Amino acid sequence: MILKKYEALPENMKNNEVKEYYEILKHKKFSLIIKRVFDFFAALILLIILSPIMLILAIMIKLESKGPVFYRQERITKYGKKFRIFKFRTMVQDADKKGALVTMGQDPRITKVGNRIRKCRLDELPQLLNVIKGEMSFVGTRPEVEKYVKEYSNEMKATLLMPAGISSRASIEYRDEDEIIN
């Protein structure tokens, strides 16, 4: 994970707030490389070990409902780059056309298998592919949709100096987000 030169950052990231965080990160280049190497090999090993479980989940999803096994959506990662996030599909096909972007509580679009997969957070397993590709990390900020990233303050844009993460401090502290919101 090599840090770009500040001058090479996207124009919307060149501000004093981002520069402050950039200055800290540029002194941690070796740590960033180690983090990327760890992410790659850990994701690869986990993908190999967990592939039988992932195959079973894929079969369960396919048997329960029509549609693809994977849910793919465009998200934003390091330097504002777009990528397609992979997750196991836990909702009915075309659920994003049938309701809100945010899923809360007992959303009727969630399938029975999907509900169980979500409770165990197994829907995130395909993101190991995103980690291997370098689009995500194990720990990082939430991979957001472009609509929300466009609303970022200058300081929030500093989160785009690093790849999005499968997990983050916020996702650990607010594990039951829908319970907090409701």
Regions found by a protein language model. Give the residues of each.
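Hydrophobic structural segments characteristic of membrane proteins
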Residues: 1-20, 130-182
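A hydrophobic, helix-centered structural microdomain
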Residues: 3-6, 14-17, 22-95
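Juxtamembrane loop-helix boundary motifs flanking transmembrane segments in multi-pass membrane proteins
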Residues: 18-33, 105-109, 124, 140, ...
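Acidic, Ser/Thr-rich low-complexity segments on the non-lumenal side of membrane proteins
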Residues: 84-115
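Short, conserved beta-strand/loop elements in beta-sheet-dominated catalytic cores
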Residues: 115-134
